[in-house]
From Swiss-Prot:
GO terms for cellular component: axon terminus; dendrite; extracellular space; perikaryon; postsynapse. Residues 20-51, 78-102 are annotated as: Disordered. It holds the Pfam family NPFF. The keyword tRNA processing does not apply. Residues 1-22 form the signal peptide. This is Pro-FMRFamide-related neuropeptide FF. Belongs to the FARP (FMRFamide related peptide) family. Residues 23-66, 81-94 form a propeptide. The keyword Cell membrane does not apply. PANTHER family: NEUROPEPTIDE FF, PRO-FMRFAMIDE-RELATED NEUROPEPTIDE FF. Keywords: Amidation, Cleavage on pair of basic residues, Neuropeptide, Secreted, Signal. Morphine modulating peptides. Have wide-ranging physiologic effects, including the modulation of morphine-induced analgesia, elevation of arterial blood pressure, and increased somatostatin secretion from the pancreas. The neuropeptide FF potentiates and sensitizes ASIC3 cation channel.
Length: 115
């Protein structure tokens, strides 16, 4: 989120919270008497804390370092379009001398469906 979007969101939140405080607990037209009796008054601590916490979280979100474009770019690691030079080389049974030769002698071709 860039600074312009965050500023616009902040402005909208401030306008919405100001309108809700100006209207009071009953809304624009006074609301129902049932709700007015249940909610005998506004909760000033909770109402004052909510916009403040929203502003604080928005400011912290703006100050957080974003992920670098290099993190978002994750090329296909295997197959075509790889950046390594090893992709052009072919593996051979003798290429890995670290592996013992009995391993390659045990590897037999599989014959599926033929008897």
């Amino acid at each position: 989120m860039d600074a312009r979007q965050a500023a616009a969101l902040l402005l909208v939140l401030l306008l919405v919270t100001d309108w809700s405080h100006a209207e009071g607990p009953g809304g624009r037209d006074g609301g129902d008497q049932i709700f007015m009796e249940e909610d005998s008054g506004a909760h000033p601590a909770q109402d004052a804390q909510t916009p403040r916490s929203l502003l604080r979280s928005l400011l912290q979100a703006m100050q957080r370092p974003g992920r670098s474009p290099a993190f978002l770019f994750q090329p296909q690691r295997f197959g075509r379009n790889t950046r390594g030079s090893w992709s052009n080389k072919r593996l051979s049974p003798r290429a890995g001398e670290g592996l013992s030769s009995p391993f390659w002698s045990l590897a037999a071709p599989q014959r599926f469906g033929k008897k």
